[in-house]
């Protein structure tokens, strides 16, 4: 049975590989002409660069070894290298396409090492050897046995059937000692591993099966911190986001049919204090505000009879509402939690669509644009006007910082990433919040676009802006909010600092990602921060 499945999928695998094109073109964006182009932004789709003032996808170079050098079959092909069918008994085979049927340190075989050590890079796996596929990498079908078979396998669509740290498996790890630790991204689940991650059908057992699983629609049947499951966690702690209930875990939350051991589901509460009569918009739509597009997405099952919170998410420079709709982790966290999410197009400027966050990029009145959108959406959909939040990445992070300066009367809190207030805005007296404003900024120490320590930046030639720097931005917000004392380490180990003794009961935070670059921060953490606040 396994053989027939493997052979049937081989054809699909080879066909799809042969017909593959640039990944970004399938998303409507050009491919960078230079595969070594500078990485400006990274998301779930891949690495993004900029060419001709537009986003482009950076295509990874793929090795294409068409060598059919048969090597020395006699004496087993020791140190053979480059053989398409393999070394049937020798050591240090290297670069074989069909596998080493008994040698050590096989390396780079697409069909697998049937008994050798340190196989490496096999797409079908090691069917039996000692340490059969350690540090294998890039195996699509997995390791079907072996002691510690397939440790740190990585990127397997069907799974490691016994190894640790499988990584990216679509069907799961069906056993093994700590099978599939840090698996990640499996749609059917890790059947025994830790930190499964992103499984759609769940983890059905195992030692600490599926800890920090995340995003499973049917549930984690034994793991902790499952997260985002629609039908329930049947034994794990901190399940989260389940629609039908947690049948034994702690903090499961909010079931439609009752709490049988924990809480679950979208944790955001809808307000009954808002009159929703006549507000009929409750499904995904595009609005036109001042000639710009705004994409509005509604949570699954939204009925419009109770008022939901709204997250406004600003895109990076040269981005768009359409691009950022699929790129923001903060938006995904909010939508999964039951909030409405809006993605707005920035105004066209010298460097593409941008936001007016200082003496660069665009002269548009984005503050009034945001106000106009809020007025429109609250008249058409049942939005809680006291729980409207802002977030964004890069220049979108700058706009969500600036929202606190100019929109604190309509925006309840913000969670910006990878941008500071411009010194010109602060020194020019343009940041005067109407009230104490809660804000949590995310910044990477290795950001090469908006430097962590701040300084002069020429985003647009001839129109420089001066970033305050992460720490100074943090202190400036604390000062404007009347915070006293020293910031606390909010959660040990996550390198987040938080001022909690501030006017109006607000908080001011900074999460520093050591070694982090120019990227969006922890989306769930950002959303969890803002949603605790509402307008007075």
From Swiss-Prot:
It catalyses: feruloyl-polysaccharide + H2O = ferulate + polysaccharide. Residues 22-59 are annotated as: Cellulose-binding. GO terms for cellular component: extracellular region. The keyword Repeat applies. Its EC number is 3.1.1.73. Keywords: Carbohydrate metabolism, Glycoprotein, Hydrolase, Polysaccharide degradation, Repeat, Secreted, Serine esterase, Signal, Xylan degradation. Inhibited by the specific serine esterase inhibitor AEBSF. Residues 78-249 are annotated as: 12 X 13 AA repeats of N-Q-G-G-G-M-[PQ]-W-G-D-F-G-G. The keyword Iron does not apply. It is an enzyme of class 3 (hydrolase). Residues 1-20 form the signal peptide. One of its GO terms (molecular function) is feruloyl esterase activity. Component of the multienzyme cellulase-hemicellulase complex. Involved in degradation of plant cell walls. Hydrolyzes of the feruloyl-arabinose ester bond in arabinoxylans as well as the feruloyl-galactose and feruloyl-arabinose ester bonds in pectin. This is Feruloyl esterase B. It comes from Piromyces equi.
């Amino acid at each position: 049975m396994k053989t027939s499945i493997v052979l049937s999928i081989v054809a699909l695998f080879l066909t799809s590989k042969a017909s593959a094109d640039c990944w970004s073109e399938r998303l409507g964006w050009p491919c960078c002409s230079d595969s070594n182009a500078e990485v400006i932004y990274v998301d779930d789709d891949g690495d993004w660069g900029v060419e001709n003032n537009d986003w482009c996808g950076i295509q990874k170079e793929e090795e294409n070894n068409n060598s059919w050098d048969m090597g020395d079959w006699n004496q087993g092909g020791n140190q053979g290298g480059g053989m398409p069918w393999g070394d049937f008994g020798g050591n240090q085979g290297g670069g074989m396409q069909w596998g080493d049927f008994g040698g050590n340190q096989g390396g780079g075989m697409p069909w697998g090492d049937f008994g050798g050590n340190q196989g490496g890079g096999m797409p079908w796996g090691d069917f039996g050897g000692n340490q059969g596929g350690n540090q294998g990498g890039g195996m699509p079908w997995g390791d079907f046995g072996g002691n510690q078979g397939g440790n740190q396998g990585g990127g397997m669509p069907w799974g490691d059937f016994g190894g640790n740290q499988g990584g990216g498996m679509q069907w799961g790890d069906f056993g093994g000692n700590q099978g599939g630790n840090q698996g990640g991204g499996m749609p059917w689940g890790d059947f025994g591993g830790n930190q499964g991650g992103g499984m759609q059908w769940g983890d059905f057992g195992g030692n600490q099966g599926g800890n920090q699983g995340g995003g499973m629609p049917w549930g984690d049947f034994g793991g902790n911190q499952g997260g985002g499951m629609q039908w329930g966690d049947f034994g794990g702690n901190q399940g989260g986001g389940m629609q039908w209930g947690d049948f034994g875990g702690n903090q499961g939350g909010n079931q439609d049919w009752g709490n049988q051991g924990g809480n679950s589901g979208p944790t955001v509460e809808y307000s009954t204090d808002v009159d929703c009569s006549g507000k009929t918009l409750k499904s995904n739509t595009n609005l036109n505000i001042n000639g710009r597009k705004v994409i509005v997405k509604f949570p699954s099952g939204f009925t419009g009879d109770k008022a939901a919170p709204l997250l406004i998410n600003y895109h990076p420079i040269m981005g768009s509402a359409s691009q950022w709709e699929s790129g923001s982790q903060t938006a995904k966290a909010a939508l999964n939690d039951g909030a409405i999410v809006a993605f707005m197009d920035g105004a066209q400027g010298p460097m593409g669509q941008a936001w007016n966050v200082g003496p660069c990029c665009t002269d548009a009145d984005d503050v009034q644009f945001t106000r106009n959108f809020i007025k429109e959406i609250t008249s058409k959909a049942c939005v809680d006007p006291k729980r409207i939040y802002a977030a964004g990445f890069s220049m979108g992070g700058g706009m969500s910082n600036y929202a606190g300066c100019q929109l604190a009367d309509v925006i309840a809190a913000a969670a910006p990433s990878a941008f500071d207030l411009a010194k010109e805005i602060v020194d020019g007296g343009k940041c005067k919040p109407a009230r104490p404003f809660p804000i949590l900024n995310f910044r990477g120490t290795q950001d090469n676009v908006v430097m962590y320590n701040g300084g002069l930046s020429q985003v647009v030639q001839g129109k420089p802006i001066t970033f305050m720097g992460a720490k100074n931005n943090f202190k400036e917000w604390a000062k404007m909010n009347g915070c006293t004392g020293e910031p606390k380490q909010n959660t040990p180990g996550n390198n987040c600092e938080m001022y909690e003794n501030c006017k109006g009961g607000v908080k001011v935070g900074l999460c520093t990602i050591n070694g982090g670059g120019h990227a969006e921060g922890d989306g769930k953490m950002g959303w969890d921060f803002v949603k605790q606040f509402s307008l007075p």
